[in-house]
Amino acid sequence: MKENVYNPLTGKTNLYYDEQEERLKIRIPERANIAMDTVGRFARGARAGHPALIFEEDDGTLKRYSYAELDGLSDRLARGLRGLGVGPGEPVAVHTGQRPETAIAHLAIHKLGAVVMTLSQLYGPDTVAHCLDDSGTRTIITESSVWAPHRDARGRYTSLEHCIVTGGATGDERAFEECLVSDETPLESASTGSEDPALLMYTSGSTGLPKGLLHGHRIVHAYLPTLTLCYNLELDYPDAVFWTPADWAWVGGWLDTVLPAWQHGQTVVASAHRFDAEWAFNFMARHRVTHSFMTPTALKRLAEVSRPRERWDLAIRVICTGGESLPGDVIRWAEDELGIVCNEFYGLTEFNHMAGNCKALFPIVPGSMGLTYPGRRVAIVDDQGNEQPDDVVGEIASWRDDDPSLFLGYWGDPGVPERMMLGGWLRSGDLALREASGYFRYQGRNDDLIKSSGYRIGPAEVEDALVRHGSVAEAAVVAKPDPDRGAVVMAYVRAMPGIETGEPLARELQDYVKKNLAMYKYPRVVEFVDAYPLTSSGKISRRTLRARAAGEAE
């Protein structure tokens, strides 16, 4: 457990974790089920009546669900889904935001041994069509307002048979409430193994369309020790209240916030309200939020608000953060202005929590990614897989060694792809260096993948969307450094002959990508070009374009 973990004071093997050794062991049971290992664990005991979820509507109306109530509603939905033929191993799409129905759907699908496929509300018809068709998904659970732009595209979703809608079904859609089947007989949850597929998340890569990444039921057990550190050893803090503004379709929102809270019988509060810093402070004060996961982008927004402790009676104790690099001044702001702990961690959707912080055990160095977390072997390697000495920039990598937090593979392609391996190392695609103290410092991406505000954006899918617009002959998309978001999408566009370029066309292309891919994937910067710089092999030189974009950002 202590291999490659350093004591920043002595430079030797880290002793900080020793006193927590039992607590931080990764324990993977042979049989596991996310629903039964979280809400189901407390639904029939002394904690059954404790609030598991409190949802605040936009008008301030509150909906409260105890552990027993949430468990019972998920039983009813599971029966309804089973009546539609949903069975073990089958993907069911959940295309909803922070709502009670999202939680109920996740639990119900897991109880059937089926696979939850998370779809962000931000996805446009092109992305949704790809995800549904690639996975062969027959059933989707969505919101009427979210589904509205997809109704006209329904014919493109060739595998889809059942559309379950909250907030008003039309045509052949089924109302969510009608799928809640009552039965006095207790539902017997499917007996799933720890490595059986449980979660399917489509993530962007540096090339091609998004790929369906699979995690097994073991993931909640594999994450628990490292999340214990992220939350500063306070996952079991008495009557804690957890909240995240992050989308529940992503790892940060669901796996890093909701599920660990429910593994400890805690309360989660939620809202579909669009994030706004002033609103967020009001929300946290109103619900006495004690623990939160936020992206660095959200934290930067909070840091722009003056005198928060004077203006709000806050209960917040710990904020953990990840997904992009966090500026050191934001950590200092959290400590000085809020009087709280802000623990940053580093990881990928494929294999998470490689390194991070835990102020309860060791000092936080602002601007660093923290130390290697227990149960991990992390190094900086060169392009041959050789470990690099301290203070040398290389690719951050994790030793495979049957890490239970590792994803199962991609949909239809089990196992870790060869391109991600370098000897026994799992490649991250991120550049970093490790200081002599053992702390890692992020240096940037090693490929074309764009990381903006914590989102992963593949340039190829944005380029494909732009080229489908009739005014575009060719497009090249790169990351443009941005002090607020880490990076933004920048598109170098060559227009069709005779097309007038300028601001009106740039806005039209931005709106086109927003509509067809996702709001967060549109190019915030569009530059029209007559030609592209080329490599010796005649390919577009993305390295040159990235350098140009970086130069323009200065």
Spell out what each predicted region is.
Residues 63-68, 198-225:
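Conserved AMP-binding A3 loop
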Residues 221-244, 248-291, 305:
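Conserved AMP-binding/adenylation subdomain of ANL enzymes
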Residues 263-266, 289-294, 303-364, 377:
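Gly/Ser/Thr-rich phosphate-binding loop
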Residues 123-130, 140-143, 292-295, 398, ...:
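AMP-binding/adenylate-forming catalytic core of the ANL superfamily
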